[in-house]
From Swiss-Prot:
Annotated region described as Disordered, given as residue ranges: 54-74, 86-118
Lineage: Eukaryota, Fungi, Dikarya, Ascomycota, Taphrinomycotina
Function: Required for efficient passage of the G1/S transition.
CDD domains: CYCLIN_CLBs_yeast_rpt1, CYCLIN_CLBs_yeast_rpt2
BP term (GO), one: positive regulation of proteasomal ubiquitin-dependent protein catabolic process
InterPro entries (alphabetical): Cyclin (IPR039361), Cyclin-like_dom (IPR013763), Cyclin-like_sf (IPR036915), Cyclin_C-dom (IPR004367), Cyclin_N (IPR006671), Cyclins_cyclin-box (IPR048258)
GO CC aspect terms: cyclin-dependent protein kinase holoenzyme complex; cytoplasm; microtubule organizing center; nucleus
Family (UniProt): Belongs to the cyclin family. Cyclin G subfamily.
Organism whose genome encodes this protein: Schizosaccharomyces pombe (strain 972 / ATCC 24843) (Fission yeast)
Gene behind this protein: cig1
Protein name, entry field: G2/mitotic-specific cyclin cig1
Length: 415
């Protein structure tokens, strides 16, 4: 592949024209509010059955939003083969491939070391291990194995009880291997944490519309974060990144995933089917086809064994897990730790105050380790309707037992 082809390939996720900062994107009947400045033209799910098209207001003139790639898509996009992708060392410092003077400016893309100071982002809460924690974990395992109760004996063959410890440890290794770096946004030029927040909120709306599994949602967000950590993306392409990640996650997790035509219909022509396919393939190649991130649901199911799969605790914990998707402070945190914290906090909210040795064994964490992260999740619930609007509305339905409203009111009552 010649240099010109590589340059054309790189322009797919980076638009040639600079964005005009005086543009204001307006959505009709949309829950996504796009304010002044640089914001991607997200298509709200509420609009998919409407004839009204969103408009781009520039000064006093209105013009329709069209595809950001124009008619020259085939000339502007080409693929690199597997060898070239490996030669680029995709797991190194993120780059924007299309710049001629990249080598001279590569130092400016280096992620800062230590505590990140970009915006309000802090390093995610990582559990600290003390001798007391390790002793409590060993004691819990010894007690459970010596005197198992009937509730502790797994009879469901689908849970593969004979290999349960090995599977659990393997998933823990995957969660560390496939976790995105917490400070990746420092390498981006046109997008920020606000853009990511809007994108994830839109992904949740699409998940609700297609009734997708929670596993699909979590995997999609993981793919988005990992992709953005190794590829500089323009603002106009960020929604295509989200759409591609959700399409991949659906194929991996769903029994009957929506078709690519369903996804193209959701964005109402902003991106064509061919563009989505090409973006999907490019994302998979850049991530080295490694999409086996375990997600929190498997860990949550294991912890639930400590309470005989109590439905109320699990439902509330599922909501608290999804809340962490919206805040950048949780990026890079071990997902088993997020699942354990969500379960611990849901127990506290429902009046189950004891974190027993059984909980320690199945979660792998002590209550002392979980409390700091639980406090951070509580902070996210103070202004829940604004912090995670789509998730809040999703879990305010009767079929979800209105756990979002319950959690919001509980936090307000204790602070």
């Amino acid at each position: 592949m010649d240099v010109s082809t590589q340059t054309r390939h790189a322009t797919y996720f980076q638009d040639e024209n600079q964005l005009q900062k005086d543009h204001i994107y307006v959505k009709k009947k949309s829950h996504i509010k796009l304010n002044t400045g640089v914001r991607a033209p997200f298509k709200a799910v509420d609009n998919i059955n409407q004839q009204d098209e969103p408009t781009l207001i520039e000064g006093n003139n209105e013009s329709s939003i069209s595809s950001s790639t124009g008619d020259t898509f085939e000339e502007d996009f080409a693929y690199q083969d597997k060898v070239e992708i490996e030669e680029r060392s995709i797991r190194s410092t993120p780059k924007s491939i299309g710049d001629d003077d990249l080598e001279n400016r590569e130092g400016s893309f280096d992620a800062p070391e230590g505590i990140l100071t970009h915006g309000k982002h802090r390093l995610p809460t990582i559990p600290e291990w003390t001798k007391e924690d390790l002793a409590a974990l060993s004691e819990a395992a010894a007690r459970l194995q010596a005197n198992p109760s009937p509730e502790d004996i797994e009879t469901d063959p689908s849970m593969v009880p004979d290999y349960d410890p090995e599977i659990f440890h393997y998933m823990q290794s995957l969660e560390r291997k496939l976790a995105p770096p917490p400070n990746y946004m420092s390498v981006q030029q046109e997008i920020d944490w606000v853009t990511r927040h809007m994108l994830v909120d839109w992904i949740v709306q699409v998940q609700i519309h297609f009734r997708l599994l929670p596993e699909t949602l979590f995997l999609a967000v993981n793919l988005i974060d990992r992709f953005l950590s190794i590829k500089v993306v323009s603002l106009q392409k960020v929604q295509l990144v989200g759409l591609s990640a959700l399409l991949i996650a659906c194929k991996y997790e769903e029994i009957h995933p929506p078709s690519i035509y369903n996804f193209a219909h959701v964005v109402q022509g902003i991106f064509t089917v061919d563009e989505i396919i090409r973006a999907e393939r490019y994302m998979l190649m850049l991530l080295d086809f490694d999409i086996s991130w375990p997600g929190p649901m498997s860990f949550l199911r294991r912890i639930s064994r400590a309470d005989s799969y109590d439905h109320d605790i699990r439902m509330l914990a599922k909501y608290l897990q999804e809340v962490t998707l919206m805040d950048e402070i949780f990026i890079g945190a071990h997902i088993s730790f997020i699942a354990a914290t969500a379960y611990y906090l849901s127990m506290q909210m429902l009046g189950h105050l004891d974190w027993t040795p059984c909980h320690v064994y199945y979660s792998g964490y002590t209550a002392r380790q979980l409390k700091p992260c639980a406090i951070i999740i509580m902070e996210c619930l103070v202004d829940a309707p604004n912090h995670h609007n789509a998730i809040y509305r999703k879990y305010s339905e009767n079929r979800m037992k209105r756990v979002s409203a319950f959690a919001h009111n509980w936090v307000l009552s204790v602070i």
